[in-house]
Amino acid sequence: MRFVYHPLAKEPVLKIEGESYTHLYRSRRVKSASRLDLRNLKDGFLYTYEHAEITKKHALLKLVGARLLEVMASKKTHLILSVIEIKNIEKILPFLNQLGVSKLSLFYADFSQRNEKIDIAKLERFQKILIHSCEQCGRSALMELEVFSNTKEALKAYPKASVLDFKGETLPASADFEKGVIIGPEGGFSEPERGYFKEREIYRIPLDMVLKSESACVFVASIAQV
């Protein structure tokens, strides 16, 4: 663990309780003499705290230092992924986070599984996964998440995003990944959707094998940092 997340990190005094307390003082057995580095994942600062008090249910920390230390990928990557099974989205979130993806937009394509509903509770769960990933890899800012109800909405929001499909030019490392790369569901895009893409740059992955959507995401995120 590179640091501990706390939404109020930078305050002079912090109270650690609940799940964070259990993890730090019961699982990791942090001692009162040790210092802790914390982040709020918003301002890029690493805050150092000393223990003022440790009780059976909470701990009080006192701020003793702060330094700007941004840990992010050198290139920004925006993936626009059609909704797949929730469990598969959850599996790839840590990988995308570690590979420096700056934003993940989810949208319901024509062939998306409509029974997979992404509500506020699901987004909060996704964010929790990303927070744990940041703590492990050291990333200093959270990946942005958003959801669109259909393909047209996603295209309207990102008019310069390119498309990953079965046909097109080989995806180059020089592509503008910050403008967005649209990745379809397992069954690909419908014909009406392909009609929407006529004015877009179309790329393909240089493999003869058909990749699952989550594999395509990891591939694109990796190429973007080359």
Swiss-Prot record:
It catalyses: uridine(1498) in 16S rRNA + S-adenosyl-L-methionine = N(3)-methyluridine(1498) in 16S rRNA + S-adenosyl-L-homocysteine + H(+). One of its GO terms (molecular function) is rRNA (uridine-N3-)-methyltransferase activity. InterPro entries: Alpha/beta_knot_MTases, RsmE, RsmE_MTase_dom, RsmE_PUA-like, tRNA_m1G_MTases_N. Keywords: Cytoplasm, Methyltransferase, rRNA processing, S-adenosyl-L-methionine, Transferase. One of its GO terms (cellular component) is cytoplasm. SUPFAM superfamilies: alpha/beta knot (SSF75217). Specifically methylates the N3 position of the uracil ring of uridine 1498 (m3U1498) in 16S rRNA. Acts on the fully assembled 30S ribosomal subunit. PANTHER family: 16S RRNA (URACIL(1498)-N(3))-METHYLTRANSFERASE, RIBOSOMAL RNA SMALL SUBUNIT METHYLTRANSFERASE E. It is found in: Cytoplasm. The lineage of its organism: Bacteria, Pseudomonadati, Campylobacterota, Epsilonproteobacteria, Campylobacterales. This is Ribosomal RNA small subunit methyltransferase E. It is an enzyme of class 2 (transferase). Belongs to the RNA methyltransferase RsmE family. One of its GO terms (biological process) is rRNA base methylation. CDD domains: RsmE-like. It comes from Helicobacter pylori (strain ATCC 700392 / 26695) (Campylobacter pylori). Its EC number is 2.1.1.193. Transmembrane segments: none annotated.
